[in-house]
Each structure stands twice: as structure tokens, then as C-alpha cells.
Amino acid sequence: MTLEQTISAIRPLDEKSMTAARNRFANIAMPLGGLGLLQDAIVQLAGILGQPVPDISRRAAVVFCADNGVVAEGVTQCGQEVTATVAENMGRGESTVCLMAKQLGMDVFPVDIGVARPIKSEKVLQFSVRRGTANFAHEPAMTRKEALEAVEIGIKMAEMCAEKGYSLLIGGEMGIGNTTTSAAVMAALTGTEAAVVTGRGAGLSTAGLERKIAVIEAALALHRPDPNDSIDVLHKVGGLDIAGLCGLYLGAAAQRIPVVLDGVISCAAALLAVRLCPQSVHFMVAAHRSDEPASILLLDALGKRPFLTAGMHLGEGTGAAAGVALLDLALAPYREMVSFADIGMEAYQPQK
């Protein structure tokens, strides 16, 4: 589907299934609200899937790999050649998210949506829009047409996952320089100062961080992206990986597949998606708060409370994978626990 068709296909959650899930929680033999945010997430999953007892056993990670021309400004500790190396590791099932996914029975689909050099792996899906973005310090990151194309590739990935029968998705990314692009996107969408939303990424020095902030400030002043137009923001200061994730989240909502969000880059893409279609936020589950400074601001903008605050900032979808593990743990008692009636005990009642 096109972006417009996808947005028009997104419908509200199933209130009947959510009510049934809340009633089940009220009757199984545990304290009211005992599973906290995980309990809320299970109710949300019920509404997305239309299942009072949600089945998320078929799960996949879609990881978008892309390079960013702004790396030329010295905003990263390592060179962009690392993107291709890690993408090829994903093709071999050897990256961090692949090894975590293996423990969760989760399939991983790495996608080359814009790596600077061709990827030497048949296991990496080839959907390259261009060989890395332009340096947004001097020119727009990509054309508006390329931004839209990348979003629609993400939609296509969600449709592929629906056809394969997956009932839960996580989105990941790999791209040197993408904490710079995500900070620029966050600043553009919310008007927050670059210094507030920009972090050290993969270990920048203080001098490097100051340079990174200055580059983002200058790019925003140069391009003036429209905060009310997600495609314009992507076109001017975004990344192809972020665009792909944005499309994945919209496509998953249209297919009624829940998505577990990862860290700051994932949440920047999620905010772009929500600006395009506010209803899509209801299909997103927040896994963790990243160690990047923009993370809590993005989660607040999305109205999300994450399960985990573990200081993670690895990317690839690893924080989302950790969130899936917690969902599995919470679903076990939800599915199998006896009710208060079964054990002859009066159910807990809400107290004023």
C-alpha cells in the first residue's frame, strides 16, 4: 500500500478484547495491578490483536541499515564503513540483536535501505534507496521522493511480516551517525534545542559532542524543516533507517500487528509516524528508556511509559528485544494462573 492508503487503513483498538483482558486480570489470583506497566501492555496487545489472551509467539525483528552523509562532519567516533560490517554480521546471525532474538524464538530481517557500499550477504534484504544520505550540514539529506520511498519500503516490510503470519514486530536500525539524525529529527519535530536532545552516541568525547550539537543547530537553521510535515523533516535532516522504521510502524498498525519500540532512533521514527497518523501510537509498546538524552523527551511526546530503564544505548532493536522477554514473562501467569474462584478466595477490590 501507499503511505496514504496505509494511514487510511488504521483503525481503533478492539475495546471488547481489552475489556475482557482487564476482567481476566481482575479475577486471576494476583494483587490488582500487580504486573504494573506489563499488565497495561497485555491489555493493549489484546486490543491490537483482537484476542483477550494475546498470542505473540510469532515474532520478528526488522532492522534497517543505512549510512548518513553527516558523518563527514566528525560527529561520530568511528567511520561509516562500520555500518556495512555490522549489516553483514546480521546476515550471518552474529550481531547483538540476532543473538538476543535467538533466545526469544524471533526471526530477524536485516534490510539494506541505504548502506554506502553493497552488502555482501544474501540474507540481507536489498531495498537500497540510495548509497547513504547526503551531508545535511550542506544540503538536504535526501530528496522528498526518496524519503517517501523509504517510508513505503518500511510499510512493505510490515506487509511482508503480516503475510508470513507474525503477531509481534520490533524495529531496529544500524547506521553510523544515526544518533545525529535522530537528534535533528527530534529537535525539528518538537522545537527542543539541539543541546538538550543530543547525546554522545557511541562514545563521543566532550569536544565531539559540542561539534555534533553545532552541526545539528546549523543544519536546522539552514533547512528549516516543517515540524508539521514528517516527510519534509526526513527529506531535510533525517536518515533512511529512520524513514524505514517510520513506515514499518505505520504499516504494522494498518496490519494490526503490535510493535515494540526500541531506543531513541526508534522513538524518533515513531514520533514521525504519529505525526502522520495519531492513531498509530496505540499500536506501539514502549520497551525501554535509552541512555540518550532525547529518549525521555521522545517517550513523553509519545505518551509512553517504558518497562525498563537499564542504561541501554546499543541500538539494533536490542532494548525492544529485552521488552519482548518481559512480555513473555508477564503473559505466562496471565494465560495460566488460577482465578480467585478456583482457590475459594474473594477477589481483591479497588479501594478508595
Regions found by a protein language model. Give the residues of each.
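N-terminal loops that bind phosphate or other acidic moieties
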Residues: 2-352
